[in-house]
Design a protein with these regions (language model features):
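Amphipathic, Lys/Arg-enriched alpha-helical "gate/interface" segment within cytosolic domains
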Residues: 2-139
Length: 139
């Protein structure tokens, strides 16, 4: 079994997301809000973890509790997706409504080719199935 890196994350009051390590070594994020404080915390955490991803990583974002995403959230996600270190990442995003889905689609459309591979889903099962597909190495 591969060794799991410890997750350098601790819950803080007022931060509207949690993250756990997936069995495949990726991360499972659950957002309850997308406030500026939450976004700032997530951005810092996400960038910290980009740099230690030396192999393909599968991340899951559960955004079903969010009713919409702000422009700020979209910009930060794009910034993370466009980082050269993000090319090794496959991200499944589970959304609960059309508004959030459209925002995530916008992020996917604006992400440069060769960046993060993104999939958008309405249920966890489809997201997991997609994440589990064999990884294609993008050059």
């Amino acid at each position: 079994a591969m060794e799991m890196k410890p997750l350098n994350w601790k819950p803080e009051p007022g931060i509207g997301y949690t993250v756990t390590r997936r069995s495949d070594g990726g991360m499972h994020y659950t957002f309850t809000d997308a406030s500026p404080a939450t976004l700032a915390h997530w951005r810092e955490f996400a960038f910290q973890h980009l740099y230690d991803s030396d192999r393909l990583t599968r991340n899951l974002y559960d955004l079903r509790q969010l009713s919409a995403l702000s422009e700020t959230a979209i910009m930060i996600a794009l910034e993370a997706n466009s980082d050269p270190a993000a090319r090794n990442i496959r991200v499944a995003v589970v959304v609960g409504n059309e508004k959030t889905r459209a925002a995530i689609q916008q992020i996917a459309d604006l992400t440069a080719p060769g960046g993060v591979e993104m999939g958008i889903f309405m249920d966890m099962e489809s997201a997991e199935t997609w994440l589990d597909r064999p990884l294609t190495i993008l050059t």
